[in-house]
Amino acid sequence: DNIRVPICEGFKRPPFDVKQGLLNSMIDHAFVERGWNSQPWVDTSKDRKSSQKGDFSIQTECGLNILVEVEFGNVASTFRDLYKFNLAYSTESYDCGIFILPDKDLAKRVDTIQNVDGARTLIEDARDSINLPLVLIGVGFDGNEIDLLTIKNDVNYWKTYKLDDFNSVIRD
């Protein structure tokens, strides 16, 4: 199943038409629906010393503990995520990580965010200091966008959304 990227022309200056908050909610919903834990502690030890949380985690049938970070934010957010992966390694809480970021084309439509190629460069530059094995995934458009104006033809509505307003959109 694919997530339809939510777009709304006019809610920001061109070319930024992707509704990032809704996209994040749709990704959250997709992971939880597939059995992943949402907002897990990065340090899972009984005497936890860190209050850091990841985006998702799961323990596979073979016992592999996986931490996921989905990042549609700026470069500083990418560094925070890389810190969380190192914390997961140092606390021996997770066996590997999955780092999901937009590809270049999607990043250009979201506004001032890091893309998967930029993150790859950061990881390669810091390869001696990133200890948790990582799978890096770039996501982009597949041509199956959802034009939010076909749901409610009111740009101002989409500019001032609340998370609760999107339950019907996320489920569809």
Where would I find each of the regions flagged by the language model?
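Generic alpha-helical secondary structure signal
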Residues: 21, 25, 114-117
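Catalytic cores of nucleic-acid endonucleases
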Residues: 72-127
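Domain-level recognition of nuclease-like catalytic cores that cleave nucleotide substrates
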Residues: 104-172
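Generic surface-pattern signal
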Residues: 5-8, 28, 32, 124, ...
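Active-site metal-binding core of divalent-cation-utilizing nuclease and nuclease-like domains
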Residues: 13-17, 24-64, 74-83, 90
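A short, surface-exposed helix-loop junction/capping segment
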Residues: 2-14
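Structural motif
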Residues: 65-66, 96
